[in-house]
Amino acid sequence: MTQPNPNKQSVELNRTSLFWGLLLIFVLAVLFSSYFFN
């Protein structure tokens, strides 16, 4: 089982992890702002 282009696979994985990281930071920022400004 050899991947035709492993570089593209790692780039896709990187983009997905970056997206989830930004989403997590956004959710934490919303929670903290609602906690502080309430």
From Swiss-Prot:
Record-level GO cellular component terms: chloroplast thylakoid membrane; photosystem II reaction center
Membrane topology type: Single-pass membrane protein
Main location: plastid
Compartments reported by the entry: Plastid, Chloroplast thylakoid membrane
Xref: InterPro entries: PSII_PsbL, PSII_PsbL_sf
Biological processes annotated in GO: photosynthesis
Keywords: Chloroplast, Membrane, Photosynthesis, Photosystem II, Plastid, Reaction center, Thylakoid, Transmembrane, Transmembrane helix
Database matches in Pfam families: PsbL
Sequence intervals crossing the membrane: 17-37
Subunit composition and interactions: PSII is composed of 1 copy each of membrane proteins PsbA, PsbB, PsbC, PsbD, PsbE, PsbF, PsbH, PsbI, PsbJ, PsbK, PsbL, PsbM, PsbT, PsbX, PsbY, PsbZ, Psb30/Ycf12, at least 3 peripheral proteins of the oxygen-evolving complex and a large number of cofactors. It forms dimeric complexes.
Family note: Belongs to the PsbL family.
Function: One of the components of the core complex of photosystem II (PSII). PSII is a light-driven water:plastoquinone oxidoreductase that uses light energy to abstract electrons from H(2)O, generating O(2) and a proton gradient subsequently used for ATP formation. It consists of a core antenna complex that captures photons, and an electron transfer chain that converts photonic excitation into a charge separation. This subunit is found at the monomer-monomer interface and is required for correct PSII assembly and/or dimerization.
Protein name, as recorded: Photosystem II reaction center protein L
The organism of origin for this protein: Zygnema circumcarinatum (Green alga)
Lineage: Eukaryota, Viridiplantae, Streptophyta, Zygnematophyceae, Zygnematophycidae
